């Protein structure tokens, strides 16, 4: 497997999920984030002691956005043709085998990935014991 290209340190500025205001108070209010639009809303007016809203400042560095912790960008792979598109980019991209690939085809994909030197993120997932 090829090591990733050098890159700036991956920083996640906010790992907690942004929850909707009053989702803890009322069961009918789901946790999915909704922007507060009321004229008197303390969350919208950013009063001290209230939940924080998602803002552009929480965004990731453009160079490290969508990177996995290994430093590769993950590409979903369903067949050998998809896998072979990554041969020239083994340092910057890693393959992730799709959920709907059978365990029989998964074994062939893993063997081909090893031959090409492509990193597979979910290599241990759903492998047949006999194969």
UniProtKB/Swiss-Prot annotation:
One of its GO terms (biological process) is translation. Keywords: Ribonucleoprotein, Ribosomal protein. GO terms for molecular function: structural constituent of ribosome. PROSITE patterns: RIBOSOMAL_L32E. InterPro entries: Ribosomal_eL32, Ribosomal_eL32_CS, Ribosomal_eL32_sf. One of its GO terms (cellular component) is extracellular region. It holds the Pfam family Ribosomal_L32e. Belongs to the eukaryotic ribosomal protein eL32 family. This is Large ribosomal subunit protein eL32. The gene is RPL32.
